[in-house]
Amino acid sequence: MSIIIGINAFHADSSAAIFKDDELLFAIEEEKLNRLKHWAGFPELSIKKCLEFTKIDSRMVTDVSMNTNPLSNLNKKIPYFLQKYLFGNKKKEIFKRIKNKIEIKNYLVENLNFNKSVNIHFIDHHLSHIASSFY
């Protein structure tokens, strides 16, 4: 049995969805819960609501899929990052964003009681759009 949480985070309209054996059970956007239009942070309330609605314990989640891969297309991103973040006024922001994505497993284990053995999958952002059309 597989239980998968899909997370759209750090991007406009953050949300979460939960699947059991490839069947969508529940999905919700964070803005429906925190009342902040087009929320672009981490959808913690959405994840909790997915688990609550389906009555699934967070320790039973086998996989988490993130809507972005912080290391994809790095060769194209580096010139942009250098110009905007390294030499601009947002120097620390880019490193914080990448760090948040990479450390997602620690956050889920420490704050939402996920099992340490949960598998984290980083999916390229555009591939995530393509995959969503399947459902």
Question: Language-model segments: what does each one mean?
Answer:
Residues M1-Y135:
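Short acidic/glycine-rich loops and adjacent helix/strand connectors
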